[in-house]
Every structure is written in C-alpha cells, then in structure tokens.
Amino acid sequence: MSIKYSNKINKIRTFALSLVFIGLFIAYLGVFFRENIIIMTTFMMVGFLAVIASTVVYFWIGMLSTKTVQIICPSCDKPTKMLGRVDACMHCNQPLTMDRDLEGKEFDEKYNKKSYKS
C-alpha cells in the first residue's frame, strides 16, 4: 500500500474551506433555536467567527504562498510551489525536495522540522 502525499499549501486551503462549511453549518443550527434568542445568537456568532477564521487562514496562506519557491515537477512538468525542505507536487503528489542531502531518501515530513538533523 503506497502512502498518499499531499502538498502543504493544499492541506491548509482544505482546512480553511472546511472552516467555511463548518461555520455555515453551526450558524444554520441556530435557526432551530428561534424561540431562545440567546442560544440562536450564540450559534450564529460562533458560526460567523468560524467563517471569519477561514478568511484569516486564506489570507495567511495566500501571503505564505507568495514567498514559496516555484519549481517544475519532474513527473508532470507543471509548476508547483515548494514549502519547506520536502513537499509534494500540487498536481501529481510526487514527493519533492530541494535538499541534496535528502535526495533518494524515503519521503517524510519530519525533515521540515528544525529539530531534525540530516
């Protein structure tokens, strides 16, 4: 069984998208408590805060995405963004590294940690 690799930027974008849907769902739950205005308002505010949090996450990953290194994936020949020492292609999920010490080694995201010594 092969391991499914995923690009870090796409993981964060997926998290932000899930925050939007979770926030809308929580706010929608407030409709069922129309009789109690406090509970309804609480649900709607928590849902609204989740949507605002997703906006902050989208803004943050957008700013981070502008600082990343763009490379051409050797497998699919498409441009992809590299975040950290090891990452995966955004299109084909091919494990990538720009560190010569890690070439040929098994893909592991622990290589991105500052505490890791190669």
From Swiss-Prot:
Does the record bear Membrane in its keywords?
yes
| Subcellular locations according to the entry | Cell membrane
Q: Which Pfam families match?
A: DUF2614
User: Could you tell me the keywords of this UniProt record?
Assistant: Cell membrane, Membrane, Transmembrane, Transmembrane helix
A single GO CC term, please? Answer: plasma membrane
InterPro entries to which the protein is assigned, alphabetical: UPF0295
Q: Which residues form a coiled coil?
A: none
Identify its membrane topology class.
Answer: Multi-pass membrane protein
Does this UniProt record's set of keywords contain Membrane? yes
Main location class: membrane
TM annotation in the entry: 12-32, 43-63
Domain of life assignment: Bacteria
Q: Which family does it belong to?
A: Belongs to the UPF0295 family.
* Cross-referenced NCBIfam families: PRK02935.1
The name of this protein is: UPF0295 protein BA_0538/GBAA_0538/BAS0506
Which source organism?
Answer: Bacillus anthracis
